[in-house]
Amino acid sequence: MATKEQNLEFLNNALSTMNQLATNPSTPKNIRKNIGDLIEGLKAGEYSVSVRALNTISSLDDMTQDPNLPSYVRTSLWQAVSTLENIRE
């Protein structure tokens, strides 16, 4: 089980990866908007870190299924998912 500090480190790493995609002008506009919404959801303190991470993982997984998604974006999204999967409470 990860400690609270480790969970926050994983969360910050995932947020960094997602923020890079959200601010990259070569990322499709609809993906940037969706990622921006997910970032806000991760930062909101309404639910526990693990619940926020699981909700984000689900949404990111749905986004990676889009066949029109550029491969570099898909790879970065998988990286964020992999980081978020390490969060445990």
Predicted stretch roles:
Residues 1-89:
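Peripheral, non-catalytic segments of secretory and membrane proteins
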